Amino acid sequence: MARYRKKPVEIEAVQWTEDVSMRTLIDFTNGLVKLNDVDRDFHVYDRLHDTWVRFEYGDWIIKGVQGEFYPCRDDVFAATYEAVTD
């Protein structure tokens, strides 16, 4: 069986925590958000797949290379990504 390595690709991401303002989340997702304060549900509309994607508190919201959004748990994000310094 052949083995593959993920290409190094820079992504944009923001973590949904109490330190991040709703304005930051709205701006990052181009206003494609729904938030339910009671359940702490947060959804971002993914135009590429024409669906609402659910995020849990503490998840990273990743904007993919085609503008799609997907969630990533904090532990997985830490093991997979590192900050880009220019």
Locate the predicted segments by residue.
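N-terminal non-globular leader segments, chiefly Sec-dependent signal peptides
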Residues: 1-49
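Short, compact, well-ordered microdomains
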Residues: 50-86
